[in-house]
């Protein structure tokens, strides 16, 4: 019974870490990545569609993203959507292809990004601790209902804390890896 609570808690914490990784993918580093454009929606004949559903995205060079719309008439709406996304990118088109050149990040901007990364990591840690609290509450409820003994509760609480510590350490690893990536010139 305690194993169910702990495994449910662990999978919930794993989802929190996955969510953090997805959030980090959206953060601009010094390198071009199509994931920078994941959140951009384009007006495609009256319907808001993700950018990757109206154009082919590619990264031909470390600081360049190219977009090749499937329909040449889509170039102006795609450029407008990119400008409205406030990513600090200026689209340039040659009639068939849109190029996005990523300017190099300044030292000051890199430090701002690292601050943002640390905030995301702290939010993830808070979420993990909240999941821990819910799991401990569930275990105490089981003990109150006499479904587990007090000794089982103490053992399970220790296991919950161990799982929590390992997930917090994984969050720190993810942060450290992304921080290195951002600070790399």
Swiss-Prot record:
Keyword Acyltransferase: no
A biological-process GO annotation: cytoplasmic translational termination
Keywords attached to this entry: Cytoplasm, Protein biosynthesis
InterPro entries (alphabetical): Ribosome_recyc_fac, Ribosome_recyc_fac_dom, RRF_sf
Protein name in the entry: Ribosome-recycling factor
Homology family: Belongs to the RRF family.
Principal subcellular localisation of the protein: cytoplasm
NCBIfam families: frr (TIGR00496)
SUPFAM superfamilies reported in the protein's UniProt record: Ribosome recycling factor, RRF
GO molecular function terms attached to this record: ribosomal large subunit binding
Protein role: Responsible for the release of ribosomes from messenger RNA at the termination of protein biosynthesis. May increase the efficiency of translation by recycling ribosomes from one round of translation to another.
Location in or out of the cell: Cytoplasm
Keyword Transferase tagged: no
Gene field: frr
Organism of origin: Geotalea daltonii (strain DSM 22248 / JCM 15807 / FRC-32) (Geobacter daltonii)
Gene Ontology CC, one term: cytosol
């Amino acid at each position: 019974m305690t194993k169910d609570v702990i495994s449910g808690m662990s999978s919930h914490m794993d989802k929190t870490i996955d969510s953090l990784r997805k959030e980090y993918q959206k953060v601009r580093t010094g390198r071009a990545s199509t994931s920078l454009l994941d959140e951009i929606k384009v007006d495609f004949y009256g319907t808001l569609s993700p950018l990757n559903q109206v154009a082919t995205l590619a990264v031909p060079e470390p600081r360049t993203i190219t977009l090749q719309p499937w329909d040449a008439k889509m170039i102006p709406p795609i450029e407008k959507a990119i400008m409205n996304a406030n990513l600090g990118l200026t689209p340039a088109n040659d009639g068939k292809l849109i190029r996005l050149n990523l300017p190099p990040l300044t030292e000051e901007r890199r430090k701002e990004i690292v601050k943002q990364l640390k905030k995301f990591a702290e939010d993830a840690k808070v979420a993990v601790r909240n999941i821990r609290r819910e799991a401990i509450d569930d275990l105490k409820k089981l003990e109150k209902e006499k479904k587990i003994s007090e000794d089982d509760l103490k053992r399970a609480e220790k296991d919950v804390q161990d799982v929590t510590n390992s997930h917090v350490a994984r969050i720190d690893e993810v942060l450290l890896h992304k921080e290195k990536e951002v600070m790399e010139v």
